[in-house]
Amino acid sequence: MINDKLVHFLIQNYDDILRAPLSGQLKDVYSLYISGGYDDEMQKLRNDKDEVLQFEQFWNDLQDIIFATPQSIQFDQNLLVADRPEKIVYLDVFSLKILYNKFHAFYYTLKSSSSSCEEKVSSLTTKPEADSEKDQLLGRLLGVLNWDVNVSNQGLPREQLSNRLQNLLREKPSSFQLAKERAKYTTEVIEYIPICSDYSHASLLSTSVYIVNNKIVSLQWSKISACQENHPGLIECIQSKIHFIPNIKPQTDISLGDCSYLDTCHKLNTCRYIHYLQYIPSCLQERADRETASENKRIRSNVSIPFYTLGNCSAHCIKKALPAQWIRCDVRKFDFRVLGKFSVVIADPAWNIHMNLPYGTCNDIELLGLPLHELQDEGIIFLWVTGRAIELGKESLNNWGYNVINEVSWIKTNQLGRTIVTGRTGHWLNHSKEHLLVGLKGNPKWINKHIDVDLIVSMTRETSRKPDELYGIAERLAGTHARKLEIFGRDHNTRPGWFTIGNQLTGNCIYEMDVERKYQEFMKSKTGTSHTGTKKIDKKQPSKLQQQHQQQYWNNMDMGSGKYYAEAKQNPMNQKHTPFESKQQQKQQFQTLNNLYFAQ
């Protein structure tokens, strides 16, 4: 049976039903129908039955109307409700009036269908001009938005849409998950050997080791076997874990406890505190090396399968990374345009922290004046800062055109794998971490996000040496074959795929021909001036006496008795940094230096 009261309601309120804030939502239309008092029978149902049965009756009445006048009510199917649509998108008022006139003759004056449609479109597209209508619409909208969150409204469409929107915002793109899986299956691992946490094992081993020059030479297995009876599992633990054995010396006072500096102590032979030596059985080390090599071989085979290539070079599977490249230079006076553009830059400036350090430092003005903005059009930069220079580092990044997007903390651990809370780790307070600012320039689409965390837990090494884990983070962000630069680097910072510059490097090594050409032009323009940078070098020919000195010098060079070859023989590290310099090229360089010397 047709519910004529519902038909009358749809005719009288079709404009409000289709427009915001109701927007045709069935359950909101139902609520308006009930609250308007259009149907006494429905009100009776409301008092006697639950809301689900009421809404079912309302839906059945709509179905009866559609059966009587097809296409008079049209819905938009939504996936939130599987069994029925949830939204009315169109009401044919003309057809509904005809239907209502069947029950109440001549109640509505009928117009043409086209005029009815025009009336509907006009009402939907025309904005209310009167202030009262605007206020009414605003009040209805605020009423929809400001519902009581303590009341269970899970059945209302607006609550369902809100939950759906929140879930959609919380959902991470598939690219994040794929990038994380790619990093998991293609990143090579390093060997890991667990550390024994039983202090009694270290005490027993300290009485069974033979130490010479702060090195463990051998173990007395007879004593260890005797201790096995009272300490079951001791031998198995020795063969499967790392042990730190106390290095007891005549001057050691056990009551003082562990040294704050442990293996970094500068007075190791005279310090009265307890120090430790690391013991790893050779069989355990070999087994760990084999397992690591086998795992990395399997991982390298995964790299050859390009199952996800977003953010990587198109030839990632077959392309090999460039060998390590470096230039020894004074960064403050170097022309960064020689290097070109990079995707990732790491900078570890020697901030002036007002302490006696074994290396030179730069003042703030010099660091702020570095033209780092020339190195990237878009990309990411990692800037190491001290506690004093955090705000200065952020200001520098902003001046270079970067936005500070994150801050990574390096949690330092000592020889025993514990966090550092004492020792030479700060000026005013002992620092247990260091700060790394992350800056972003431009809007690079190729960065792989949400792979690593903003914490690095790693052991300290030489003074000012930073953890190697940062290189892995940078390569996973930008890709293995992206151009990467490290500024203020040293010999231990050079690595394949990276370009390193700094004044503590040994020699030069450049594989990129374009950079080599620009560097030669830069050096040529630089050597065309005197050491003061103002006086031009006189290009006159050397005198006869000067030529004799030069000839004698080259003879010594050819015989290998020159100072350069003597030093190179004593320090073979100097030889590996000149792969492009033939003997003739070396002569040309020394010839240039001699000309400069004899011209003065």
Curated annotation (Swiss-Prot):
Induction: In response to starvation conditions. It is found in: Cytoplasm; Nucleus, Nucleolus. Disruption phenotype: Severely decreases N6-methyladenosine (m6A) levels following meiotic induction. Increases the rate of degradation of KAR4 and MUM2 protein. It comes from the Eukaryota. It catalyses: an adenosine in mRNA + S-adenosyl-L-methionine = an N(6)-methyladenosine in mRNA + S-adenosyl-L-homocysteine + H(+). Residues 525-548 are annotated as: Disordered. GO terms for biological process: meiotic cell cycle; meiotic DNA replication initiation; methylation; mRNA modification; negative regulation of pseudohyphal growth; sporulation resulting in formation of a cellular spore. Its EC number is 2.1.1.348. It is an enzyme of class 2 (transferase). Pfam families: MT-A70 (PF05063). Its main location: cytoplasm. Keywords: Cytoplasm, Meiosis, Methyltransferase, Nucleus, RNA-binding, S-adenosyl-L-methionine, Sporulation, Transferase. GO terms for molecular function: mRNA m(6)A methyltransferase activity; RNA binding. GO terms for cellular component: cytoplasm; nucleolus; nucleus; RNA N6-methyladenosine methyltransferase complex. SUPFAM superfamilies: S-adenosyl-L-methionine-dependent methyltransferases. PANTHER family: N6-ADENOSINE-METHYLTRANSFERASE (PTHR12829), N6-ADENOSINE-METHYLTRANSFERASE CATALYTIC SUBUNIT (PTHR12829:SF7). Belongs to the MT-A70-like family. Component of the MIS (mRNA N6-methyladenosine (m6A) methylation) complex, at least composed of IME4, KAR4, MUM2, SLZ1, and VIR1. Interacts with VIR1. Catalytic component of the MIS complex, a complex that mediates N6-methyladenosine (m6A) methylation of meiotic mRNAs and is required for initiation of meiosis, progression through the meiotic divisions and sporulation. M6A, takes place on the adenosine of 5'-[AG]GAC-3' consensus sites of some mRNAs. Positive regulator for IME2. This is N(6)-adenosine-methyltransferase IME4.
